Each structure stands twice: as structure tokens, then as C-alpha cells.
């Protein structure tokens, strides 16, 4: 596994402990995870760690609220296409965008009806196009050596890792090719 792969895996695991907003569909708890005790009351909104929210959603105890929809993916792809060849035109995404996308795909795969299958196909197409456009823009940013924080703030945590790794490779490979390491 590459360093980037390890970094992305660590980021993915760390996101499991981030809190997510949920709508409580049925009373649940108390539950002590060693750090805090949680009890959820039907009809309320609460925040729980994502790994717990996912498990409780499978049991129909909660519904995760801060998820991403097909409509939102459509809006993002529309905006990304506006200036597809301009790397500084990256749309600002939530830092946990790819985590939300992963949760959407997981949720659609769990459902076994025809409509969900069609939504899964549509979501996959949108996500692949978003990734393709954004990756192209990120490579251009790294190649041009762009360090404008306003632009970099539009990247997700995963994209920041990709950007930094590509930038490092470009800077150091060019130096190696001509016989000295660039800084």
C-alpha cells in the first residue's frame, strides 16, 4: 500500500468517530462507549458518532440527517462543469464529502428495490464525473504550484492529501531528472 493509500485509510477511519446529526425514530439506550453515555429519545434530533449512527440506522432506530442527495450531486456536477478547464473554479465541498458519498452508496446498495438500483446507477455516474473533473483540476493546481489558501479551502480532506502528494512528486521528480532536488 502506498503512503497516500495509508493516509486516505487513516482519514476514513478517523471520520467514523465524527458526530453526525440524526433524527431518532425509536427510543434507544443507554449506551456507554467508554467516553460518554448516550440515550436517544424518539422524535428528537441528536448527534452521535458516525459508526453508531450507521448501526442504528440499519436497525431503523435513527435516520442520519446530514447526508448527501442525488439532487445535491447534480448541483455539484453542474457547477464543476461550468469552468471545467479552470482549476481555480473548484466548487467548495464539505470536508466530509467523500464520506457522505460513501454512506449514500452503502445505503442505496442495502435497499433491494428497483428505484434504489436506478438511483445507485445515477449516483455512481455523478460521483465518477465529479471525481474525474476535480482530480483533473487538482493535478493542474499541483502542477502550477498553486498555494492560494482560498482555492485550497475548497478541497476535501482527501483531495488535500492527493494535492500535496502530487505537488511533492512533481517538485521532486523534476529536480531528480535534471540532477538536483527542487525545494
Residues of each region from the PLM?
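Charge/polar-rich, low-complexity and marginally structured segments
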Residues: 2-12, 69-183
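Compact, well-ordered interaction domains used in eukaryotic information-processing assemblies
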Residues: 27-70
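N-terminal, Lys/Arg-enriched amphipathic/low-complexity engagement segments
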Residues: 1-33
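Short N-terminal secondary-structure initiator segments
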Residues: 16-18, 42, 49, 86-89
Amino acid at each position: 500500500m502506498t503512503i497516500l493509500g495509508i493516509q486516505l485509510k487513516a482519514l476514513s477511519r478517523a471520520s467514523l468517530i465524527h458526530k453526525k446529526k440524526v433524527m431518532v425514530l425509536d427510543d434507544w439506550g443507554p449506551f456507554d462507549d467508554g467516553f460518554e453515555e448516550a440515550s436517544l429519545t424518539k422524535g428528537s434530533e441528536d448527534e452521535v458518532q458516525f459508526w453508531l449512527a450507521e448501526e442504528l440506522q440499519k436497525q431503523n432506530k435513527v435516520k442520519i440527517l446530514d447526508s448527501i442527495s442525488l439532487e445535491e450531486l447534480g448541483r455539484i456536477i453542474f457547477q464543476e462543469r461550468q469552468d471545467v478547464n479552470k482549476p481555480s473554479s473548484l466548487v467548495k465541498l464539505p470536508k466530509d464529502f467523500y464520506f457522505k458519498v460513501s454512506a449514500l452508496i452503502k445505503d442505496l446498495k442495502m435497499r433491494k428495490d428497483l428505484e434504489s438500483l436506478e438511483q445507485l446507477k445515477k449516483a455512481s455516474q455523478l460521483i465518477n464525473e465529479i471525481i474525474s473533473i476535480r482530480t483533473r483540476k487538482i493535478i493542474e493546481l499541483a502542477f502550477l504550484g498553486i498555494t492560494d489558501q482560498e482555492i485550497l479551502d475548497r478541497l476535501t480532506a482527501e483531495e488535500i492529501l492527493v494535492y500535496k502528494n502530487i505537488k511533492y512528486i512533481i517538485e521532486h521528480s523534476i529536480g531528480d531528472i535534471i540532477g538536483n532536488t527542487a525545494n
